[in-house]
A protein has these predicted regions:
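Short, solvent-exposed secondary-structure boundary/capping segments
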Residues: 79-84
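Short, Lys/Arg- and Gly-enriched loop/turn segments at beta-strand edges
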Residues: 52-59, 67-70
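Structural motif
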Residues: 41-42, 56
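Structured surface patches comprising rigid loops and adjacent beta-strands/short helices at the edges
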Residues: 96-103
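Short, positionally conserved secondary-structure boundary motifs
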Residues: 1-35, 65-67, 74-78, 89-91, ...
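Short, well-ordered loop/turn sites that connect or cap secondary structure elements
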Residues: 38-39, 52
């Protein structure tokens, strides 16, 4: 699950840009989402919520692995977390829990 101890800093974000709700920034790690324009070290702004729509990029807690950033995909009645890099495989949603939905990416220069 998301760890409160991992909080490094609290910042105020303008409601006019990001809306209301509980938000947090996550450092992207690895190359599984490069096809979506999210690179290792980028900051991803996440809205805390437990539900997602088909195509959303989500943070999910995967049993035995921890948190991961992937695209939420529905194929018929089956739901997967889909990496945006062909060298990785889909993760069945039954093995994980949605923590939030990505709403913005801040690139590191």
């Amino acid at each position: 699950m998301l760890e409160e101890e991992a909080v490094e800093e609290i910042v105020q974000l303008p409601v006019s840009l990001f809306g209301r709700g509980s938000l947090f920034l996550l450092h992207a790690s690895g190359d599984s989402m490069t096809g979506a324009g999210i690179d290792d070290g980028d900051l991803v702004l996440i809205r805390k919520q437990e539900e997602a729509q088909n195509g959303d990029i989500v943070v999910a807690f995967v049993e035995g692995e921890g948190n991961t950033l992937k695209r939420y995909r529905m194929y018929g009645q089956t739901v997967f977390l889909h990496p945006e890099n062909p060298k990785y495989r889909d993760i069945p949603l039954k093995d994980c829990k949605i923590q939030g939905v990505a709403i913005s990416v801040i690139k590191q220069l």
